[in-house]
Each structure stands twice: as C-alpha cells, then as structure tokens.
C-alpha cells in the first residue's frame, strides 16, 4: 500500500498526490551482545553487499534523470522551484517561529523537534551538538526541553567547522556563536598558535579526541549527542554517501567518545549502502540498547537524508577500541570496521530501511518531482495553488502531532540578531 494518497480528484491533474509520508519512518535494528572485534582492514564476501549495491544503482538511475537539468541555469532554477513547491513544509517554519515564540526555525529545527517528540528519550537536559551551526538543533532541543519536558535548565556545548581562512564567514547567521562563545568548543584561526588549537574539523583524529575531552570537561554527564554534518557535493549526489564517509565516521566517533552511559545519540547519514557505513552501524549496535534508522516527515523525501538514532548507551569504549577507531580515522580507509558476515540479521534490518526510505519513498518522490517538472514547467503558480489547501491541512496536523507549545521569553536562547554570518 502506498505511503501517499490522492487528494485532487478529477480534471486534468488528477494524478497529483500529496508529497507527505503518512508516518515518521523508524526501523529498529537488533542489539549485538557478542564481543566487538574491530579490524583495521578487512574484506567482505561480495554476496553480502550485492543487494546494497543493487539498491545504490537503482536509486542513482532515478537521480540521473535530473542530471541534464542541472547543466543549464534556467532548467536548474525551474527544477528547484518545482521541488520547493512540492515541499509540504514550505511556510511552516515561519508559522512555528511566530506562533510558538521559537528561534532559529530552519528545516533542521523541524527535524530535531520531530525526532525528540517521536523517540521518547529518557533525558535531553544536557546536550553536545556537533556540526551544528547555524544552530537549529540546539534551538529545537531548548524549545522541547522547556515546553515539553519542563526541565529547570538546559545545558549545552556545541562545535562546528571554523573556516581556515580568516576572511571566510562562520555560518553564524543568528548570532548563536557570537552571543554564547563559552558554549562552543572550536576555535578561530586567530588562535592557531595555541598548542591545543581545534577548528572543529571532525575528519582530523586529534581534533575528535580533543573535542570529546573539551565537551566532557565542560558538561557532565552528556545525555544527548547530535551531529548534523554533511559535505556539499555540488551536483554529484550519486557519490553523496561515499564523499561523506570520513566526516560521518568522525562525527560518530566524537559522540561515542563523549556521550555518557544511558545517553542518546542522533547522527545524520545519507544512503546506507557502502560497506563502511554498514560496518559503522554494526559498531553502534554494540553500544545502544535500542538502535534505529529514521526518516522524519520533515526531512525532504526527495533527498537521501537519514538519521541514525541510538537510545540508552550501555557501555563506554575500552581503551583498545578507542585506540583502534582513532587510528582508523587518522589513517582512513573505507574497508569495513568489522567482519560483516557476523551481522547478517542486522544487515537484513538495514536493508529493509534502505527499501523503505530510498527504494520506495525517495524514488516515488523523485519521479513525482520530474512529472511535476514536465507538467508545470511554466505553470508553477498553478502547481502551488493546487497544493496549497493540502499543505495547510498537513502542516496543521504536523503541529498537533508534534505537540508544539509557546516558549516563554525567559527560556529563549541568547542570540545576536545583527550577526549575518561573520564573527570577529
């Protein structure tokens, strides 16, 4: 049964469907009780990876239909206008900001709030948010903690990549860094001469170890670790997972080095077909009582974005595990971290997630987007008019399902409204 339903009956465009999944997608993965054996370099029987490679090919074939449109500025602009029109959350961000006194309401804010509301974490009152600017995750956690959990305080630390050039702007669009410098772990290039200088780059092993140390020195215990990192791949979406392997490993390792026992973790990923990504998920399965692959409804269904969620950390690293993983990051290669043949049941669950999120939902939406492009190339206003009534219904429903309440002024984050990206 399709995840989507028809809403415009009759007439020339009766094929139009809403672009909203009926549910928050959440696929559970089994906990692994057997010992974790990390390997610096290993091989995997091709049969284990065959269906993941096939899934990658199928998805990339559909993505490739958009590639010619990216080559010309005019067609690229039209395509993005169409994709923006079928974004069921367009307009919701402003409504949330003004109706609920919310701050930094980006799409990241919506996703994090939805994750918090759906995953039922035991405690989120102390958080380390990595790869964080401009600050949507922190703001959503702050809003959720005070309006839903009613914690007396919310304590947080954060980090983001600080540009290497002193002339480049830090993406501090809302002034969260500028007005809260003591909460941030990374440092300006002006401090390069310091022995423990750290620019927040989680692809550098020494940075990862240092960030985890700084986080735990400033905030203990850490109940929630989040990381929303992603490298801009331009138009090369077919290699999005591959190009982000090292970054996603680094942000995960930072979390596993800093998150307290009993804590929860949320990590951004894209497709989940590469052997290294699969092995990293296998590693996670040894540390959390519950592990999930998720796709919030507010995560645009035309993209490959997924979030891996770990609930209730059961144990910390052994010294040997920490040493092996840091060494792998320092001398990175993308062979699996573990012998994947030992994780057949878990990989079946991961593949079910791949089928559900990418082979069904994403492909259906990409095809829908291309059909809208062909039919509404010069009629974008007409498309918007058709979709507007259902967008309102869906956005109102989303607000009810996710239990939004007004944030009291005294609980708002300190922001510097004048900041537009650059920080002195």
From Swiss-Prot:
Q: Which UniProt keywords apply?
A: Early protein, Methyltransferase, S-adenosyl-L-methionine, Transferase, Virion
> Predominant location of this chain?
virion
GO MF: mRNA (nucleoside-2'-O-)-methyltransferase activity
Q: What class of enzyme is it?
A: transferase
Say if the entry is tagged with keyword Transmembrane: no
One GO term describing the cellular component: virion component
Which InterPro entries does this UniProt record tie to the protein?
Adrift-typ_MeTrfase, mRNA_Cap_2O-Ribose_MeTrfase, RNA_MeTrfase_FtsJ_dom, SAM-dependent_MTases_sf
GO terms classed as biological process: 7-methylguanosine mRNA capping; methylation
Q: Where is the active site?
A: 268
Q: Which residues form the Adrift-type SAM-dependent 2'-O-MTase domain?
A: 103-315
Q: What induces it?
A: Expressed in the early phase of the viral replicative cycle.
Q: Where, by residue number, does S-adenosyl-L-methionine bind?
A: 135, 228
Provide the protein's localization: Virion
**Transferase keyword on record:** yes
Q: What is its EC number?
A: 2.1.1.-
State what protein this is by name.
Probable methyltransferase EP424R
**Which species expresses this protein natively?**
African swine fever virus (isolate Warthog/Namibia/Wart80/1980)
Tell me the lineage of the source organism.
Answer: Viruses, Varidnaviria, Bamfordvirae, Nucleocytoviricota, Pokkesviricetes
């Amino acid at each position: 049964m399709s995840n989507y339903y028809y809403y415009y009956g009759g007439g020339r465009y009766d094929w139009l469907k809403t672009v909203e999944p009926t549910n928050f997608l959440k696929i559970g993965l089994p906990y692994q009780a057997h010992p974790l054996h990390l390997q610096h370099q290993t091989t995997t029987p091709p049969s284990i990876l065959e269906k993941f490679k096939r899934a990658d090919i199928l998805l990339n074939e559909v993505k490739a239909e958009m590639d010619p449109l990216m080559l010309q500025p005019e067609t690229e602009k039209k395509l993005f206008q169409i994709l923006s029109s079928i974004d069921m959350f367009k307009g919701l961000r402003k409504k949330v900001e003004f109706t609920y006194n919310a701050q930094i309401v980006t799409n990241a804010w919506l996703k994090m709030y939805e994750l918090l509301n759906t995953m039922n974490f035991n405690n989120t009152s102390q958080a380390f948010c990595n790869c964080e600017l401009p600050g949507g995750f922190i703001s959503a956690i702050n809003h959720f903690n005070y309006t839903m959990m009613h914690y007396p305080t919310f304590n947080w630390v954060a980090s983001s990549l600080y540009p290497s050039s002193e002339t480049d702007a830090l993406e501090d669009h809302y002034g969260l860094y500028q007005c809260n410098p003591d909460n941030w772990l990374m440092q300006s290039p002006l401090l390069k001469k310091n022995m423990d200088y750290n620019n927040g780059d989680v692809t550098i092993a020494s940075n990862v170890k240092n960030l985890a140390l700084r986080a735990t020195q400033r905030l203990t215990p850490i109940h929630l670790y989040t990381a929303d990192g992603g490298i801009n791949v331009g138009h090369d979406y077919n290699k999005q997972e591959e190009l982000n392997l090292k970054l996603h490993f680094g942000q995960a390792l930072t979390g596993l080095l800093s998150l307290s026992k009993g804590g929860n973790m949320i990590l951004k990923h894209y497709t989940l077909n590469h052997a290294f990504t699969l092995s990293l998920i296998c590693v996670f399965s040894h540390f959390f009582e519950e592990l999930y692959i998720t796709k919030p409804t507010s995560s645009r269904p035309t993209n490959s974005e997924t979030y891996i969620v770990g609930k209730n950390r059961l144990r910390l690293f052994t010294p040997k595990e920490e040493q092996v993983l840091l060494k792998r990051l320092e001398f990175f290669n993308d062979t699996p971290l573990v012998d994947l043949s030992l994780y057949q049941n878990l990989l079946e669950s991961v593949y079910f997630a791949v089928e559900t999120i990418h082979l069904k939902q994403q492909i259906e939406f990409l095809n829908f987007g291309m059909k809208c492009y062909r039919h509404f190339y010069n009629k974008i206003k007409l498309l918007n008019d058709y979709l507007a009534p259902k967008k309102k219904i869906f956005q109102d429903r989303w607000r009810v399902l996710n239990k939004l309440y007004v944030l009291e002024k005294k609980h708002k984050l300190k922001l510097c409204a004048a900041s537009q990206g650059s920080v002195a």
